[in-house]
Design a protein with these regions (language model features):
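Substrate-binding groove of N-acetylhexosamine-processing glycoside hydrolases
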Residues: 35-38, 43-44, 122, 129, ...
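Bacterial N-terminal signal peptides that target proteins for export
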Residues: 2-15
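Feature activates predominantly on carbohydrate-active enzymes
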Residues: 77, 115-352, 359, 408-410, ...
Length: 705
């Protein structure tokens, strides 16, 4: 399949004459409709459809298990979020929600009553939605389209309990991109529970995403290679079967990404597999070893039995060690690029019996543009680029020119951050997906990564949802409209308080301009580098704390406002608390340095020295407060982790908290001891013993006596 097929798909689904009504963008009622993704064509009508005890859902095809599931899913949602009980089937009702395939006679009759011309063909995922005073019709070309129409209908329900209603309107909608995916890193720390993966599937399907990929280095519980998958931290076959069946009901294809070249250190560090490593106990499989291909064949034989579907994702990115070890001579003779592409083709040959389309990351291929022609045309390039730039054409064009299908793969920018960098993620996703659509890309895969092992997926729903909108809608995503719609679509909350908090927390990495915020959070404060940075960032630190505290206050006050996805608010609260503590830590270190140096240079002023300990708010107390705050944060982080993930790997993160707690307590004990000795010796330890570094320039210059 080539990109021309994707363009055909887009042309076929973009028939503007599918219905006799036109999109009226200027209509005030239309402008007030808040749904994500936004519909291609929407015409707001008059009146409303009241939802009550006399409302029934009717299946145009009573034998359709898929439609029955979609109907029950809608019933469960409106009961939970709007407090409305809607029944499925039963006697004829005064108000009816009719669902089914668009070609069924009963659907055709209902659309005729609603004056909707359904004579043109939709794509398989497209749907028609008509809301009248007494009848709602949700019809898809297939059961998938009907399901997506009901996801839109969920967002259209307004009011609660006896006052619940759906505003009158007509919608025709279809996706711009065939595949709309999320990749979740489950190999470098967090490994989600089965229940949480189900939450991911449900939420992604709600926003019309149709693919979820597991990024795996060593976290597949392989029966043929049981040493590799960690106990308690791997996806087991029974779990995969359960998840595949669950995802099928939500029309989400689960795609395994088992690395087949780089990123395999967790396997290659084992002595049993050491001979397969390009460099000793390294990261890259050696293409010189036949056993490398035996390992790949064994893994994918099992994965083929567990994951039905069209795709395997074989990874193949960041093979930094290639040509430095066992393949050094071959790389010297042929070039590293040639060795890479030979391996890529050999993996394809190993997996050919499974008749899957193979996805692979495109970064190495872009480094060898002259060799891109060696990529078989049936493979799919997963073209990842995370820079927030205005134009991605130069990254897309080489693969398009080679006649290769590709996914554009932006990122949620959650890696190494306390909360995702929303500014970078928004620009990356919106522009990359736009340019991918223009080039006829087969799909979009939005990526989340756990590079430092502590990222929490629950914090990343804004960029994930934004990717869903960008890939379903056509052209440049209107970010302002997306933000206007976000609180209602995601939280079922009026207003924009939650999206404002999202931008406040997501803007802190830009405000600080200090690299990754996780790294800053764990940086040793008792170093000259940290203290100099703290002084340079004093104004920004204050701004960060105000943003974090305002966000936290709003989240506390509005906790009950959200009727959907309230779990996300807990992750946002944790991020706000961590940012506030980080700012507090910076302020404490500045105060500690200033006051201790002042006391050290004025040892004869006993009142000044004693202020370090003997009054409320003294630095001695501040040091202990840091440990106390970290203890509270540690517990909050533990709870948030376990709400998403298995216990596996958690202790390695909590150990970071423990280490920093001990550091602050040790400093407070050292300060206590130093001040006690001062009473008899009139001396204090050199500030360097407390890690205070060079003397602050504003500190009085009186020499110590």
């Amino acid at each position: 399949m080539k990109t021309t097929l994707t363009r055909t798909f887009i042309r076929r689904t973009a028939i503007l004459g599918a219905f006799a009504f036109a999109c009226v963008a200027a209509n005030a009622q239309t402008a007030n409709v808040q749904i994500i993704p936004a519909a291609k064509q929407l015409n707001a009508g008059e009146g409303k459809f009241d939802i009550g005890l006399d409302t029934r859902i009717a299946l145009a095809d009573s034998q359709s298990a898929e439609d029955r599931f979609a109907a029950q899913d809608f019933i469960d949602d409106v009961k939970q979020t709007a407090g409305v009980t809607v029944r499925l089937g039963g006697n004829s009702a005064r108000r009816e929600i009719l669902i089914g395939r668009i070609d069924l006679p009963r659907i055709q009759q209902a659309l005729k009553r609603a004056a909707v011309d359904s004579g043109r063909q939709l794509s398989d995922e497209g749907y028609v939605l008509s809301v009248g005073l007494h009848e709602v019709v949700v019809a898809g070309k297939t059961a998938i389209g009907t399901f997506y129409g009901l996801q839109t209908l969920k967002q259209l329900v307004r009011g609660e309990a006896a006052n619940a209603f759906i505003p009158g309107m007509k919608i025709v909608d279809w996706p711009t991109m065939r595949w709309r995916a999320v990749s979740d890193d489950i190999s470098r720390g967090p490994v989600p529970t089965v229940d949480y993966i189900k939450r991911q599937i449900r939420t992604e399907a709600f926003f019309k995403l149709n693919m979820h990929s597991f990024y795996m280095e060593h976290t597949f519980a392989s029966g043929s290679h049981p040493l590799i998958g960690p106990a308690g931290g791997s996806l087991a076959p029974d779990e995969i079967r359960e998840l595949v069946a669950y995802a099928r009901r939500y029309h989400v294809e689960l795609v395994p990404e088992q690395q087949t070249f780089g990123h395999l250190h967790k396997a290659l560090r084992l002595e049993k597999y050491a001979e397969l490593a390009e460099t000793p106990y390294g990261d890259v499989l050696s293409p010189q070893q036949p056993g490398s291909y035996k390992l790949i064949a064994d893994w994918y034989k099992e994965l083929n039995e567990l994951f039905p579907g069209q795709f395997f994702h074989i990874g193949e990115d960041e093979t930094f060690e290639l040509g430095e070890g066992q393949s050094k001579d071959e790389a010297k003779a042929k070039g590293v690029g040639a060795v890479y592409f030979e391996h890529l083709n050999r993996v394809r040959d190993v997996l050919k019996p499974y008749n899957r389309r193979l996805m692979f990351w495109g970064d190495i291929a872009l480094h060898h543009p002259d060799l891109i022609g060696n990529v078989p045309k049936d493979m799919i390039v997963m073209n990842w680029q995370y820079g927030a730039v205005d134009d991605y054409t130069k990254y897309i064009k080489p693969f398009k020119d080679a006649g290769l299908d590709q996914f554009v793969c932006p990122g949620a920018h959650n890696w190494n951050q306390i909360f995702p960098n929303i500014e970078a993620a928004s620009k990356n996703i919106a522009n990359f997906v736009r340019d991918g659509q223009q080039a006829g890309a087969l799909g979009m895969m939005n990526t989340t990564w756990d590079d430092d092992g502590e990222s929490l997926f629950e914090s990343a729903w804004y960029p994930i949802t934004l990717g869903a909108a960008a890939s379903w809608q056509e052209g440049t995503l209107d970010l302002q409209k997306f933000d206007r719609d976000f609180d209602w679509a995601f939280f079922r909350a009026d207003g924009d308080q939650f999206v404002k908090v999202t931008h406040a927390l997501g803007g802190i990495p830009v405000l600080l301009n200090a690299g990754t915020t996780d790294e800053l959070f764990w940086r040793d404060p008792f170093t000259t580098q940290f203290q100099n940075q703290t002084r340079n960032m004093a104004e920004r630190t204050s701004g960060m704390r105000l943003l974090a505290e305002q966000a936290l206050e709003m989240l506390i006050q509005n906790d009950k406002v959200a009727r959907r996805n309230r779990a996300t608010l807990s992750a946002m609260r944790l991020a706000a608390q961590r940012y506030d503590h980080l700012g507090r830590r910076m302020e404490v270190m500045k105060k500690f340095s200033d006051q201790y140096w002042d006391a050290y240079l004025n040892l004869g002023d006993r009142a000044k020295v004693r202020k370090l300990r003997y009054y409320t708010g003294a630095i001695y107390n501040n040091l202990r407060e840091m440990a106390e705050e970290l203890s509270i944060l540690k517990e909050a982080y533990r709870q948030q982790w376990l709400a998403e993930n298995r216990p596996y790997w958690l202790e390695s993160i909590l150990a970071r908290y423990d280490g920093m707690i001990r550091m602050w307590l040790n400093q407070s004990r050292g300060m206590d001891e130093a001040l006690r000795k001062y009473e008899t010796s009139s001396t204090l330890p050199n500030p360097e013993e407390f890690g205070l570094g060079t003397r602050p320039t504003a500190t009085p210059t009186t020499a110590p006596r």
